[in-house]
Design a protein with these regions (language model features):
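N-terminal glycine-rich phosphate-binding loop for ADP-containing cofactors
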Residues: 1-405
Length: 405
């Protein structure tokens, strides 16, 4: 079956951005949302989603003319239009009952060949389709995009044990060849692949930062491009994602995996979130943009001990300065074996990541390569954890893990 027309239900940040990416690929898309009783325009939310996508930075559309491929509507007047769609994706509120109610309505109007998907990042796929027909369950597969979907390559495709393998194959080929995504087939477990391992790494980095007496800016120097990872590193990534989102995801993962490893957030982090310091969305997080007396933008750093923002100037870390200009393999090896608290922090954090990735092999996905790709495509790493272990020498890593207990 060929996907010629799609529908996205939910015109929030993710839903509208996914609709824009479909339009970028030349796929006509129906964008639906609820009716707001206090708005005379019954399509207000869907229209607002398109307008937001048109103004998004970085740009959600390759060309703003692509927005013409998006037809807006609402769930009361336009649900019947789903019968013309080959792929139907939901991106609504993260509440199980809301998703189940939606799928009951969708099943009543969607054509019997349509592929049905959820973009949920935290609600298990198999729970969403309880009570649906066998035919519906056969055509259902999770499709978890990363934000912003035009720029982050990863798409986690999550079948349930009821999903037809041909549906997984057809949809994965569409995602790769038409949408240009990097597909990782994930198991239907908490956090799937990238968030399960990536958020664990962020939480452990926070714990080790406090243990070894480092600052967020120093940690970002150590866990950014020098280590072959995204320029946003650890704490800038947290600010971009939203500290409340990190808190929510980590808390949910901890609750969903009680026998798993430590997803406990530090008290300092909890206090920051409780104060409404949520990252970019609130105007400040671990970092805060401000202007000096000349109107020039400068970045202030949050002092976790005092709770105040400080101008720390350009933060330099000796271990990072020493590897500038060297190839990635040399940088990673030098940082992993560095002396002092910086080296202690990196070894502890990297060893945690290596151990957890190895533990999750066969749990979150059935291929080691998928775990590497999920971190590279979803978090902007140059090397996945298994590729890094190979580069450092697996036996050396095992020796260090055993020494750490």
């Amino acid at each position: 079956m060929k996907i010629r027309k799609a529908a996205v239900i939910g015109a929030g940040v993710m839903g509208a951005a996914i609709a824009a990416q479909l339009a970028n690929a030349g796929i006509p898309v129906l964008l639906l949302d609820i009716v707001l009783p206090d708005k005379p325009d019954r399509n207000f939310l869907a229209k607002a989603g398109v307008e937001r996508a048109l103004k998004a930075r970085p740009a959600a559309f390759m060309d703003n003319d692509r927005a013409k491929l998006i037809e807006v509507g609402n769930l009361e007047d336009d649900l019947k239009k789903l019968k013309d769609c080959d792929w139907i994706l939901e991106a609504i509120i993260e509440k199980l009952d809301a998703k189940r109610d939606l799928w009951a309505k969708v099943e009543g109007v969607a054509k019997k060949t349509a592929i049905i998907s959820s973009n949920s990042s935290g609600i298990p796929m198999h729970l969403q389709i309880e009570g649906r027909s066998e035919d519906f369950q056969r055509r259902f597969v999770g499709a978890h995009f990363f934000n912003p979907p035009r720029y982050l390559h990863l798409l986690e495709v999550i079948p349930t044990d009821k999903t037809d393998p041909e549906v997984v194959k057809t949809f994965s080929e569409f995602a790769e060849n038409t949408l240009g995504k990097g597909v990782v087939v994930a198991n239907d477990v908490p956090g799937f692949v990238a968030n399960r391992i990536g958020v664990y790494g962020i939480v452990r980095a926070m714990q080790h930062m406090e243990k070894f007496g480092l600052t967020p800016a120093e940690v970002d120097q150590l866990t950014g491009p020098a280590l072959g990872r995204a320029s946003s590193a650890t704490f800038r990534t947290a600010d971009l994602s939203g500290l409340d989102i990190i808190s929510h995801v980590a808390t949910d993962l901890g609750a969903a995996t009680p026998d798993d490893e430590d997803f406990t957030l530090t008290e300092n982090f909890k206090n920051i979130v409780a104060k409404g310091i949520l990252g970019d969305k609130s105007g400040s997080g671990f970092y805060k943009k401000t202007k000096d007396e000349k109107g020039k933008t400068k970045i202030l750093n949050l002092n976790l001990q005092t709770g105040e923002y400080e101008d720390q100037g350009k933060v330099k870390v000796a271990a990072v300065e020493a590897v500038k200009g060297k190839p990635l393999a040399e940088r990673v090896n030098a940082l992993y074996t560095a002396e002092g608290k910086e080296g202690d922090f990196l070894r502890a954090s990297m060893n945690d990541g290596f151990w957890y990735a190895a533990k999750m092999a066969g749990n979150v996905s059935n291929r080691l390569q998928d775990i590497d790709n999920a971190l590279k495509w979803g978090f902007g790493w140059e090397q996945g954890p298994f590729e890094s272990m190979d580069a450092l020498g697996v036996q050396q890593v095992i020796k260090n893990l055993e020494a750490d207990g």
